[in-house]
Amino acid sequence: GLLDSFKNAMIGIAKSAGKTALNKIACKIDKTC
């Protein structure tokens, strides 16, 4: 239902935000950016 779609959207946003954060951290650590 609507709640499930909302939950899935939130999970998707959280995952992509987490990936971005991890990329920034990795970038600072190994200076590949």
UniProtKB/Swiss-Prot annotation:
Q: Which GO terms describe its biological process?
A: defense response to bacterium
Going by the entry's taxonomy, the superkingdom of the source organism is recorded as Eukaryota
Q: List the disulfide bonds.
A: 27-33
Q: In which tissues is it expressed?
A: Expressed by the skin glands.
InterPro entries in alphabetical order: Antimicrobial_frog_2
Question: Which keywords does the record carry?
Answer: Amphibian defense peptide, Antibiotic, Antimicrobial, Disulfide bond, Secreted
Q: Which GO terms describe its cellular component?
A: extracellular region
Q: Does the keyword Iron apply?
A: no
Q: Where in the cell is it found?
A: Secreted
- Main subcellular location of this protein, as a coarse class: secreted
Q: Any keyword Disulfide bond?
A: yes
- Per the similarity annotation, which family is this? Belongs to the frog skin active peptide (FSAP) family. Brevinin subfamily.
* Protein role: Has antibacterial activity against the Gram-positive bacterium S.aureus ATCC 25923 (MIC>72 uM) and the Gram-negative bacterium E.coli ATCC 25726 (MIC=18 uM).
Protein name, entry field: Brevinin-2PTc
Per the UniProt record, the source organism is Pulchrana picturata (Malaysian fire frog)
